[in-house]
Amino acid sequence: MNDFSFEDKGLISRSGFGSRHVRRVVKALALIFSLLILYLTISNVSDSPPKRDSLSLDDIVLQKYKPSYKQVNWIDSQGLKDTFLVKYGDLINIQDPYNLNKTLFSVSDLVYNGIQLDYDSYSISFDAKYVLVSVNKSQRWRHSSFAQYYLYNTETKDVNMLGQDNEHWTISLAEWSPTGHQLSFVYNNDLYVRKNDGNVQRLTYDGTVDVFNGLTDWIYEEEVLSSPSTIWWSPDSDKIAFLKLNESEIPTYHYPLYTAELDPSLPEFDYNKDMAIKYPKPGNPNPSVSLFVADLNSNASSNFSLWHNEPLAEPVVQNVLWVNTSSVLVQFTNRNSTCITARLLDTELKSIHTVKTECLEEGWYEVQQSAKMFPLNNSLVWENWSDGYFDILALDDYNHLAFIPFNGSSPIYLTSGAWDVTDGPIHIDGDFGNVYFLATLKDSTERHLYYVSLDTLEIYGITDNGEDEGYYSTSFSPFGDFYVLNYHGPDVPWQELRSTKDKDYCLSLETNSRLKQQLSSITLPSVEYGKLTFNDTTFNFMERRPRNFDVNKKYPVLFFAYGGPGSQQVAKLFRVDFQAYLASHPDFEFIVVTLDGRGTGFNGNAFRYSVSRHLGEWESYDQGQAGKFWADLPFVDENHVGIWGWSYGGYLTLKTLETQDVFSYGMAVAPVTDWRLYDSVYTERYMDLPQYNKEGYKNSQIHDYEKFKQLKRFFVAHGTGDDNVHFQHSMHLMDGLNLANCYNYDMAVFPDSAHSISYHNASLSIYHRLSEWIGDALGRIDPSTGVRQHRWD
């Protein structure tokens, strides 16, 4: 039994007209039709809709249809509350919500020693006195980069480089303080602060290639903080908490660069360059971590021993939060993320207090940085809410807002129900006692903005009117009177400034009118969202069909899979992507399906935790069951059902091809093939350490190569410079296939490309290879005959 039917898709009318009513309607329609024909004959005017263009693959890859969003920087300009900066072309304008709108600086102002700076990015100090611009940026890892920085004084118009003794330093990270215009930055893995008076203060002296101060190493950047920074400023900007990461015990992974960073004029050009990265794999050492707090007034740093001599060995620090100007809350898990602890440290008294420790028997604690304090200097009415913090905790299988007292007593839940708080608390209104958050209360595929009253615990919807679909995000001003509301879909995105005090206030920041105009001339697929039920479990799916879909034809079906733990692909977002191209282009006209199987997020924690310790089992089964459902539909060509994915989606593609017989074709890009080869923090969170789950690791790897010989054909692609999912994974797969005498596959290798496969025009190349290959597999329509041709049948 399942929830999907033709009625859901609008293929069968469910009108309830009686026969007499039908006859009247038919007569009326006949009269209208006759008059319409007469009118068209007399006027000789054609009102047929204009011919639309097909989506271009190059336009998809080059993101022609990517929506625009204004970068809004909240500042404190000349004592004006809730002012912000917005970029308009080459101008950076300072605005307030009602009156002020003036240019703070122009790109033409960025001149150093007579040379116009071609900047990569910019950020503004909170007092708007300085603009920090980066130049000559080079990518480090996914979220980090190296760059040279310049400071533009908005009052004097002077431009100075960030460095010391007229040296132009290449800097790893630079961040403004929350007040004034102090600047923290990392150079050669040591932490510095540029003070308000312009002097530079060095805080650490032990930075090396293995020791990182205030900066993430590879594993913390990729799997824990999703940021290059481990710096947290105190609210008054007098102190900095930061992590010291030491990866000297981590084994080094080496991979070659064949073309990147090689100068053909040098003798060593004939030899490839060797790249080395400290990459912890399951069961191997992780970086050791220490928390320091630096007092900028005394130039003293203190090391706080938060996790020594206790069961929570090898901690992974998830979050650091300043409670006030002298106390810090630190949240960390054990190595495999089954236990979590929150500790409060007083930086002046040097005392440490455990607020909360809890463990799970099944599942894991996801990484989150959602904890927030009640605003300082709040009204005495809400004084009881100041001695603790707000965070997201599990309650009856879902994640909800809670207040956690510092005294260790039980949490107070602010929300409850069969839905998730996905982001919050975003803002806490200290005047009215309202806590703002984003949630799936309306539907798990949507995100709406709400607030809950601390007085009554009633929930009020801001974007949720009970009818309109929507996926929103938001950012609040520091004082909380205004917020930027971003609408991400399903229709064309827009951006507005709204007020928490005045419901009628609305300032449009971005309408994406140009994008709307572009979309008006192209053919897009129809998109449907629904739920599919099998084995008493319900799944969200998204289906894209050709715009001229004909129920009497037979269509190939392509599943697009990701499926990683806690992820979500079936969401009501605006997207004109590769899947839209394959569904709408007249050469292909595939039905493209995405199903969020077990292990994915926002369908209950039991649904998510079901894959714990045996990745790949339920995820592939769910894709297979969904594949069988679509293959049985009368308008589907059951012999041409394929699946493809990237990264975890590549792994899921291979695992599904290995274990499910409904798919004849598949494409796996940058796939994991053996979890023993992936990084420790991610893998152990879901699989535990290898020594405690040998059978789980064995079963989860791609290993039954005989099953691949039964496929019609499959395709694998990987970049040799992938620092995330190493090329080693695909080489292990190729070796197993060769040993099994399996020859029905194709492979594309992209020299020196990282996980995104973009180096040296590889972005265009990979998608052209994918589209050509899947066209050969599932069939390409001959424009002269309208007949679908299959290369490998």
Curated annotation (Swiss-Prot):
Ribonucleoprotein listed as a keyword: no
Membrane-side (Lumenal) residue stretches: 46-793
InterPro entries: AB_hydrolase_fold, Pept_S9_AS, Peptidase_S9_cat, Peptidase_S9B_N, Serine_Prot_S9B/DPPIV
Name of the protein this chain belongs to: Putative dipeptidyl aminopeptidase C2E11.08
Membrane topology annotation: Single-pass type II membrane protein
Keyword Transmembrane found: yes
Family: Belongs to the peptidase S9B family.
EC identifiers of the protein: 3.4.14.-
Taxonomic source organism: Schizosaccharomyces pombe (strain 972 / ATCC 24843)
Gene Ontology MF term list: aminopeptidase activity; dipeptidyl-peptidase activity; serine-type endopeptidase activity
Lineage of source species: Eukaryota, Fungi, Dikarya, Ascomycota, Taphrinomycotina
One GO cellular component term noted in the UniProt record for this chain: plasma membrane
Cytoplasmic side: 1-24
Compartments where located: Vacuole membrane
Record-annotated membrane-spanning stretches: 25-45
Active site: residue positions: S647, D722, H755
Alphabetically ordered keywords of this record: Aminopeptidase, Glycoprotein, Hydrolase, Membrane, Protease, Serine protease, Signal-anchor, Transmembrane, Transmembrane helix, Vacuole
Residue positions with a glycan: N101, N136, N246, N299, N303, N324, N336, N377, N384, N407, N535, N761
Top class in the EC scheme: hydrolase
GO BP annotations listed: protein processing; proteolysis
Superkingdom classification of source: Eukaryota
Entry-linked SUPFAM superfamilies: alpha/beta-Hydrolases (SSF53474), DPP6 N-terminal domain-like (SSF82171)
